[in-house]
Amino acid sequence: MKRTRREVLGVGAAIAGASTAGCLGAIGGATDDDAPRGKQQIEPPVTADDPDYVDVYEAVVPSVARVQTYVESRETVFGPGEGGAAGQGSGFLYDETHLVTNDHVIGDPDTICVQATDETWVNATVVGRDPYSDLAVVELDAGLPGDPLPVATDLPPVGTRVLVVGAPLGLSGSATQGIVSGRNRTIPASTAPGRFSIADAIQTDAALNPGNSGGPIVTLDGTVVGVATATRGDNIGFGVSARLVNEVVPALIETGSYDHSFMGVSVVRVDPLLAAGNDLPDASGVYVAGVVADGPADGVLRGTDGEATVDGATVPTGGDVIVALDGTEIADNPDLSRYLALETDPGDTVAVTVVRDGSEETLDVTLGERPEP
């Protein structure tokens, strides 16, 4: 009889590789035998808080895997190119056959191998990819030892304890602990650079390293609240939020892609200087710097048409300031990104409340679909 996640003990996997011909030939790697000799390894004392992390780790780790991608050698203008390992990261079991990871982990591979925490390897194939959310789904040829992990429908408050499980630097079954440090962050989409940001991201102080990407950020009841994605320095890591996972992943499984709403505007944050230059009552809302020609907002919203000097700084003037969408307050750029990402679909008409020439008015904008990255 299959044991539940709560009954299965996790086994920390070692660094391992696999042949590009398949995923059954794991080779080499570091093990506990690599510990320094001549000194007794003393385990630290267990504290009152430790059992929480032990329990959640043992419940979650069988459902987490290391993801390794490979490419075949390709002909280039300089001759045959080198093939071999292309990318490495982590992933977690979303349902019985599908593993969620990051799009930047998957890339465009010829072979995907997944290593479970019992050190077995299985082949996987790409089901769907979404560069704009940096999420991807692969289908496994065989199951993992654990059960699918539940995904939260909302984000926990700042200060909630979390655990990140994955394969940093190829070290399968690794765990780091921390708290939720922030919510509603926006981070660059690494596989769609310079175009759009990932909305509603979760921030954590748990250590993230190369290879953690795609692994779950879980609360101490084993619920996924984020997918580890990026780090911006010591104790500053980010993950795709569970709310965005719930939006994107079902579509990737069903159709292989996800369509993001597109308003067709470039925006900047309203700070005190911009507010002063535009005679705004306070530094709140999102300033429309430009409108994409022939885009959804063209002819409806207004972008910058001048500039002013405030305290020696040049600020844009004349653009609309978005203060609400469908009656929901938009206080800053992350609010706008989050609402479009979680509450709308291409083709929806949204009521955009703006401050224009000192007065509020509400205008209808029918959203389009983001262009290909």
Model-derived regions, located:
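PDZ domains, with a preference for the canonical peptide-binding region formed by the helix
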Residues: 16, 105, 313-316, 324-353
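Catalytic nucleophile loop of clan PA
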Residues: 92, 207-227, 297-303
